[in-house]
């Protein structure tokens, strides 16, 4: 009986930890979305459209962000921290290198970007 009780206790605790981690992931995604959309923070939306939406205006110079869930987190981090490491002529500012976004803020933006699954190739008619 003691073994079953221990197993049930461990299972219950593991379940609580998993729910807690999902909640914190959800909070991180929300924080990243706020940074992405807020002009006094990351303001990514000034240059990047997401999920197949298009931007119309002077700041719509960045590529449309889509299917980012398949990108490695390290690659996304590098693009945000200092895009010039992979593209020396990038117009995107180095948000991390310049100190505009902290490490935690960049990770939050990445958590949000990883929720972007839209692919124009998957939706052609």
Task: Kindly give the residue locations of the regions a language model identified.
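Bacterial N-terminal signal peptides that target proteins for export
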Residues: 1-11
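Bacterial N-terminal signal peptides
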Residues: 10-18
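Electrostatic cytochrome c docking/interface patches
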Residues: 19-39, 124-125
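The canonical Cys-X-X-Cys-His
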Residues: 32, 41-51, 109
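Gly/Gly-Pro-rich "capping" loops immediately C-terminal to redox-active cysteine motifs
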Residues: 37, 49-81, 91-97
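Sec-exported extracytoplasmic/periplasmic mature domains
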Residues: 37, 70, 81-85, 111-118
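C-terminal capping alpha-helices of c-type cytochrome domains
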Residues: 97-125
């Amino acid at each position: 009986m003691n073994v079953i009780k221990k197993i049930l206790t461990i299972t219950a605790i593991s379940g609580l930890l998993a729910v807690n981690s999902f909640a914190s992931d959800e909070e991180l995604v929300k924080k990243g979305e706020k940074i992405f959309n807020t002009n006094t923070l990351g303001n990514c939306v000034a240059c990047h459209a997401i999920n197949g939406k298009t931007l119309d205006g002077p700041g719509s110079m960045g590529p449309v962000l889509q299917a980012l869930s398949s990108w490695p987190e390290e690659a996304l981090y590098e693009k945000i921290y200092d895009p010039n490491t992979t593209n020396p002529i990038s117009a995107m500012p180095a948000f991390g290198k310049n100190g505009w976004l902290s490490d935690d803020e960049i990770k939050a933006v990445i958590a949000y970007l990883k929720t972007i699954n839209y692919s124009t190739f998957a939706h052609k008619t």
